Regions:
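Membrane-embedded alpha-helical bundles of multi-pass transporters/translocases
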Residues: 1-475
Length: 475
C-alpha cells in the first residue's frame, strides 16, 4: 500500500488499493487447490515438488518486475463511460501474476518441507530454519532502504525498485541451488488409487483437527495483515519518521531470527501448541504499548535521541551520523524500535510453530486416507491464509480510512487529528493482537502431542500394504 497509495508513491486511494489487493486473492480459490492436488499426484524423475518450484519461479519474478519496476505511467482514463486511474487494473493484473507464481512455487515447497522428516521436534527445526532464512532475506532487504537513505533516496518506491532488481538476480540462483542440493524422500502410502479433486478437498475438511488449525491460522493471518498494511503509515504519520522506516525494519527482522532458537527450546519442552500460546501472549503484551507511544509527548523519549545515544563516538563520526537525522524526532522512533523488537521476537514462533503443527496434522490424514497428501493440505491452508491476509489488509486500510486517516497528508503539518492518529495506532497494533487471541481456546488442550503423533505414525508404518512411493513416474 505504501508504494501504490503513499504520498511519495503513485498516490492512489488507500481504500481502493486495499480493495484491489483483496480482490486479487480470489484467484487463489482456484489455483491453490489445483496446484496442491496436481503436485500430490505428480511422479517425475526429479520428484513430486521440484518441477513446480522450477516453473513457478520465473512466473513470480515476472510479476514482481511488473509490480514494482513499473514500465508505464498511471493516468486517468475513460472506458465504457467510466473514469478511473489505469493504476488500479494494472495493480490487479500484475499482482495476480505474482500470486500465481507464488502459488506454483510455494505450495509444493512447503509440502516438500513437511515430508523431509516425521519426527515431532525435527519438523519444528526444519520449519524454524526455513523461517529463519526467510526472515534473513527480509533482513537483507530491510538494509536496502537504510543504505539508500544515505544516498538521498527516502521514498518507498525507490526502495522497492532496488529490492526488486536485486531479487530478480539472486532468487533464481538460490532456487536452482535448492533444487540441486536438497533431496526429495519417497513418501509412504497404503492406497495407490488416486482420489478425485473434489473428494480430496472434502476429506481434508473432515479432518477435525485441521479445521481447528484453520480457525487459528485464519484469525492470526488477519491480524498480521492489518499490521503489515499499516506499518509504514504508522511510522510516517504517527512517529513522523517515514524517512527512517528502513532503520526500523532491520532490527525488527533481526529480533525474529535471534529468538527462533529460544522458541524451539520452549516448544521441545512444553509442546508446539503451548509455545504458540506463549508467543501470542508475548506479542499482545508489547502490542499494547504502541498506542501509548503514539500519545505520549516527545519529551518523554529524550534519552533515546540519536545525539544522546551516540555521544560516545569520535567527534567526526558523531557529527557525520547525527547530521543525517537533522530535523527528525528520533527519540520516540528509537523507543518504538525497542518495543517492536520485543514484540517481533514472537513472530518467528508464530510463523514456524504452526507450520510444524500442520505437518503433524497431515499424518492424521495419512492414517485415514492411506495417502501422503501434503500438497492438498498446504494448498487449502495457503488459499485460506491468503484470503485471511487479503481480508486483513482490506479491514486494516478500511478501518484507518473510516477513522478519518488521510495517508496523503503532510506528516509535518498534518490535517489528521490526534484522535485519528491514535485510532491508526490501535488498528495497527491492538486490534491485530485481539485477532491473534482468538487462537487461545483452540490451542488449549491441543490433542496432537508428541506422544500422540508417535502413536499415529506407528499405525501408518505398520498398516498392511504400506510402502514407499518412489519419485519415478508411475501411473
Amino acid at each position: 500500500p505504501a508504494v501504490y497509495a503513499g504520498k511519495d508513491g503513485y498516490g492512489l486511494s488507500l481504500a481502493a488499493v486495499g480493495f484491489v489487493l483483496m480482490l486479487t486473492r480470489f484467484s487463489d480459490v482456484v489455483t491453490d487447490p489445483l496446484i496442491g492436488f496436481i503436485s500430490d499426484r505428480t511422479r517425475t524423475r526429479w520428484g513430486r515438488r521440484k518441477p513446480f518450484i522450477f516453473i513457478g519461479t520465473p512466473v513470480y519474478a515476472l510479476g514482481i518486475w511488473l509490480l514494482f519496476i513499473n514500465p508505464i505511467e498511471f493516468r486517468e482514463v475513460t472506458w465504457l463511460g467510466l473514469e478511473f486511474n489505469i493504476g488500479y487494473p494494472y495493480l490487479f493484473f500484475s499482482l495476480a501474476l505474482v500470486y500465481l507464481g507464488a502459488t506454483i512455487k510455494d505450495l509444493p515447497y512447503r509440502a516438500w518441507g513437511a515430508e523431509l522428516s516425521s519426527n515431532y521436534n525435527e519438523r519444528t527445526i526444519i520449519t524454524s530454519w526455513r523461517e529463519a532464512f526467510g526472515v534473513t532475506g527480509a533482513l537483507i532487504s530491510a538494509f536496502t532502504p537504510a543504505i539508500i537513505f544515505f544516498l538521498g533516496y527516502t521514498r518507498p518506491i525507490d526502495a522497492v525498485f532496488y529490492l526488486s532488481a536485486a531479487m530478480l538476480i539472486i532468487m533464481p540462483i538460490l532456487t536452482l541451488n535448492t533444487l540441486i542440493v536438497c533431496p526429495e524422500y519417497p513418501v509412504r502410502e497404503r492406497v495407490q488409487t488416486r482420489i478425485p479433486l473434489i473428494e480430496s478437498v472434502k476429506l481434508v475438511f473432515r479432518n477435525k483437527i485441521y479445521v481447528r488449525y484453520i480457525v487459528i491460522f485464519t484469525f492470526s493471518g488477519i491480524g498480521s495483515a492489518m499490521t503489515n498494511a499499516l506499518s509504514f503509515f504508522f511510522v510516517e504519520h504517527v512517529l513522523v519518521a517515514g524517512a527512517l522506516y528502513g532503520f526500523y525494519l532491520a532490527p525488527y527482522f533481526l529480533s525474529q531470527i535471534v529468538s527462533i532458537p529460544v522458541w524451539f527450546k520452549l516448544s521441545a519442552k512444553v509442546g508446539k501448541h503451548r509455545a504458540t500460546m506463549f508467543a501470542i501472549g508475548w506479542y499482545a503484551f508489547w502490542a499494547s504499548w504502541i498506542p501509548l507511544i503514539a500519545i505520549a509527548p516527545n519529551e518523554w523519549f529524550d534519552a533515546f535521541q540519536v545525539h544522546v545515544i551516540l555521544g560516545f563516538l569520535p567527534q567526526a563520526w558523531y557529527e557525520t551520523i547525527v547530521s543525517q537525522f537533522e530535523g527528525i524526532e528520533t527519540g520516540k522512533f528509537l523507543f518504538f524500535i525497542v518495543v517492536m523488537c520485543l514484540k517481533g521476537s514472537s513472530i518467528g514462533a508464530l510463523a514456524a510453530l504452526p507450520q510444524s503443527m500442520a505437518a503433524d496434522i497431515i499424518d492424521v490424514d495419512t492414517r485415514t486416507s492411506g495417502q501422503q497428501r501434503a500438497g492438498a493440505y498446504f494448498a487449502i491452508g495457503g488459499m485460506i491464509g491468503k484470503g485471511a491476509a487479503a481480508l486483513g489488509l482490506f479491514v486494516g486500510t478500511s478501518l484507518a480510512v473510516l477513522g478519518g486517516f488521510d495517508q496523503l497528508a503532510d506528516p509535518e503539518n498534518t490535517t489528521n487529528t490526534a484522535e485519528t492518529l491514535l485510532w491508526l495506532a490501535c488498528v495497527y497494533s491492538v486490534i491485530p493482537a485481539l485477532f491473534k487471541f482468538v487462537a487461545m481456546p483452540f490451542l488449549w488442550n491441543w490433542p496432537l502431542t508428541e506422544a500422540k503423533l508417535h502413536e499415529i505414525q506407528s499405525e501408518i508404518f505398520e498398516s498392511p500394504g504400506n510402502k514407499k512411493v518412489e519419485n519415478a513416474y508411475s501411473s
